[in-house]
Amino acid sequence: MSEKYVFSEKHPGPLVVEGKLTDAERMKTESNFLRGTIAEDLNDGLTGGFKGDNFLLIRFHGMYQQDDRDIRAERAEQKLEPRHAMLLRCRLPGGVMTPQQWLRIDKFAGENTIYGSIRITNRQTFQYHGILKSNVKPVHQMLNSIGLDALATANDMNRNVLCTSNPIESELHQQAYEWAKTISEHLLPRTRAYAEIWMDQEKVATTDEEPILGSTYLPRKFKTTVVVPPQNDVDLHANDLNFVAIADNGRLVGFNVLVGGGLSIAHGDKETYPRTASELGYISIEHTLAIAEAVVTTQRDWGNRTNRKNAKTKYTLERVGVDNFKQEVEARAGVKFEAVRPYEFTERGDRIGWVKGIDNKWHLTLFIENGRILDYPGRPLKTGLAEIAKIHKGDFRLTANQNLIVAGVPARSKAKIDALAREHGLIDDSVSEQRKNSMACVSFPTCPLAMAEAERFLPEFVTKVEGIMQQHGVGDEHIVLRVTGCPNGCGRSMLAEIGLVGKAMGRYNLHLGGNREGTRIPRMYRENINETEILAEIDRLVGLWAQDRLQNEGFGDFVIRTNIIRPVLDPARDFYD
């Protein structure tokens, strides 16, 4: 079951919102193309953090300043500042890296971060948590030495470009991946600030220009995907700009373009809402960059710079109308959209385990719970991946489900890699389908926005859900379950069959009614309830689903069909009904 979203064409709003600009716009204007005084701040040893505008400017360089919230109160009692440390997120379009790159990334995590871990994110890249100020410059230089960077992985730019992790159809995946890289490069900022600050490159006497992003960059974050049906592993409806691959005899010929998805909301603010992306039409492959640029520049010029909570592309589309936005994109690109070509999504989970590609090479998708790579007692995952990287000749591919694919394994190496993976706990045949299809954002202790636990809450919570599933005779099946520690949506709960959104410590809003394909937004079913209440609801509803579902009917479709909850059809207008 997949409802058709209806977007009203009654859009009285202006193309450009007038009014006082947010302070973020002042900060960008005065930053000298994202330089600020970051270089000087690096030399200030009196604080472990960045001061003033630099606190926000470092985000354009791929970093967030955080502190350990588990010890924040204790340090305050001791009259100490919070233990500031940076999160750094790598730019890795399509999630592909070499084993040699992985070994350097692994080494830095072990030697130069507080937590010693690598976190695979659902933005198909990795991030470090706990980088002290003294290690900030070295991490950028390390990434540069292996051909990577952290530019534009945060703040008001086009973020890391996602691409379907499809190891089966190798040729089609490769074409999609090349486009993900090309789009990422095309939409990067042109400022030399990153190279000057982190790579010590000399300042040149030329004026910086940003022909695509503009001198004040975008009004808000902007996310892009390249997706190969029938897999929707990238969760395209969480993204501003999506290129849905259309193939002919296994060759990529063009894309359906969908614009304006996004999941972030603010508790208590009904002017914010999640939204699925709208179809603009089909383009042939040679128009890809022109359309990408036109969508970005239209959002650059029409996006709301007076209110950051209403600044994303989804709100621009609702204000000006999809047709007006589409016509502007066509005019800027010099390209007319054709009618959308047929496509269908059937799943979005990863194929865990070994699969054979059409090129006769093998691909091993490893389930990494929460994407957290660390040596756990009895499960030395981090060591195991390093051992595999030492002998593997293909790629490592990170997925948007926070897993890792050891890709391109020749038949002669399969047994050795399988043995290493099992020896280090990277393959566990007992992992349930439910656990494989559950996901959480990071939340506590490092995220400053966290309201409730997510990553640390999920494993034990899933164990309890597994027990409920077993009790009702559906233990071999799964419900797409997502937990996010606040309403910003990083855990993508707003595209789950069961979505938990953090409200306060130990309390969540319970959303129901998304679907397995990730094309429907779930509606809030219960507000501000604790784990015991959540599990009681899941127990009751899973019991009904197990007893009364149709053949192959997913949980989310069941609760809609049986009127347990109404579907969200026009999120801007009926999400809060």
Swiss-Prot record:
Annotated GO molecular function terms are:
4 iron, 4 sulfur cluster binding; heme binding; metal ion binding; NADP binding; sulfite reductase (ferredoxin) activity; sulfite reductase (NADPH) activity
Query: What are the GO BP annotations of this UniProt entry?
Result: cysteine biosynthetic process; hydrogen sulfide biosynthetic process; sulfate assimilation
Q: What Enzyme Commission number(s) apply to this enzyme?
A: 1.8.1.2
From the UniProt record, give the pathway where this protein acts.
Answer: Sulfur metabolism; hydrogen sulfide biosynthesis; hydrogen sulfide from sulfite (NADPH route): step 1/1
- Keywords from the UniProt entry: 4Fe-4S, Amino-acid biosynthesis, Cysteine biosynthesis, Heme, Iron, Iron-sulfur, Metal-binding, NADP, Oxidoreductase
Q: Which NCBIfam families match?
A: CysI, PRK13504.1
Purpose: Component of the sulfite reductase complex that catalyzes the 6-electron reduction of sulfite to sulfide. This is one of several activities required for the biosynthesis of L-cysteine from sulfate.
Q: Subunit details for this protein? A: Alpha(8)-beta(8). The alpha component is a flavoprotein, the beta component is a hemoprotein.
Family note? Belongs to the nitrite and sulfite reductase 4Fe-4S domain family.
| Protein name (database record) | Sulfite reductase [NADPH] hemoprotein beta-component
Q: Which taxonomic lineage is given here?
A: Bacteria, Pseudomonadati, Pseudomonadota, Gammaproteobacteria, Enterobacterales
